[in-house]
């Protein structure tokens, strides 16, 4: 069975070992337009796609062996679901794969804004911390704290719950 992996620069190296070890043929190629997708997928039984997949009706119509498209990401809005259904192609995704990372990033941004990390980092890089502390001290009194405050979370989906 041939599996096509649309490369995006940093595919995990173990994928080839994993698939080939199970009797699959994994073919990896970077694709930037529909023609390249068709060339890669035309003989494939399955496709692993990640960033900005061009899984349009035209692409799928040219891939008569294609049985499944697995989207390495949360959404499937980049896949023509109507065409896939019409052509009998199963569409999969990886819900929740980035929930923790997005929640952690939101917390990091909150801390960065509250503690003025960017501004203070710039001052330190200019050497103000060591020899011109009077330029840094005004920021110290303006630094916010999260402790004792209420943080509002808009939306309690997977990411909002993880953030909480």
What do the PLM-derived regions correspond to, one by one?
Residues 1-44:
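N-terminal glycine-/charge-rich "phosphate-binding" loop or analogous flexible N-terminal tail
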Residues 29-30, 72-73, 88-100:
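Short beta->alpha connector loops at strand-helix junctions that form conserved
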Residues 77-89:
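Rossmann-fold NAD(P)-binding glycine/threonine-rich loop
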Residues 87, 95-150:
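Phosphate-binding beta-alpha-beta segment of Rossmann-like dinucleotide-binding domains, i.e.
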Residues 159:
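Hydrophobic/small residue at the entry helix of a nucleotide-binding pocket
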